[in-house]
A protein has these predicted regions:
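Sec-dependent N-terminal signal peptides
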Residues: 1-15
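Secreted/extracellular ectodomain signature
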Residues: 13-202
């Protein structure tokens, strides 16, 4: 006697706003930056799905994704529990998009399973940018030894660069943009461009 067991899993979109996390209007990081938002360094888990993850994805979720709860983060899954995730992006929207693109390597359709948000998070408005904890540490605590000719550049995807010791503001700005651009995510052909922009130091 042969018995075949078939497990069917259906992922459905949430019915209410509270089920999908903060609603986002796409606000690209653009210059000039009018306000830089930074938050306390510890993030908060925001699980958007009640699905129980199997052992493999659950281990990745708990030990890799949630390690140190670094915002902005997103964890996306396929219907067969393939997954992709990112932490340390500079915006929630970028984290969601990158996690989806990473997940799509495992299957044709992905949904965001969970996010890591900063405490007190509010969606960005035009002219605002937000920073992940590591970049925020440099922004909030510039070393006086860096002098006046210093610059910082960031990308929504989490890339950033801080440079100092240049002969002029324009040289520092060009160096920061060039260095930051070396770390921008460029291996997802369907991911929108997230170029580096200059951030005014305090």
């Amino acid at each position: 006697m042969i018995v075949d067991f078939v497990l069917t899993l259906s992922l459905t979109l949430p019915n209410s706003v509270s089920d999908v996390g903060p609603l986002l209007t796409q606000i690209d990081f653009v210059e000039p930056v009018q306000q830089v938002l930074t938050y306390p360094p510890a993030g908060v888990e925001n699980r958007l799905s009640g699905l129980q993850l199997p052992d493999g994805p659950l281990t990745a979720y708990e030990t890799d994704f949630l390690a140190d709860t670094v915002f902005f983060g997103a964890f996306a899954i396929t219907k067969d529990f393939g997954y992709g995730f990112v932490t340390g992006a500079n915006s929630l929207e970028a984290a969601r998009e990158i996690a989806i693109e990473e997940c799509l390597k495992q299957g044709p359709i992905c949904l965001v399973y969970a996010e890591i948000l900063p405490q007190g998070y509010a969606p960005l408005e035009i002219g605002q940018i937000s920073l992940a904890p590591e970049a925020a540490g440099y922004y909030n605590n510039p070393d006086p030894a860096w002098g006046n000719f210093r610059a910082m550049a960031v990308s929504e995807d989490g890339a950033y660069s801080v440079v100092w010791g240049y002969g002029s503001p324009s040289e520092a700005s060009a160096a920061a943009l060039s260095d930051c651009g070396e770390f921008v995510i460029d291996d997802f052909p369907n991911l929108r461009e997230m170029p580096c922009i200059l951030v005014p130091f305090k």
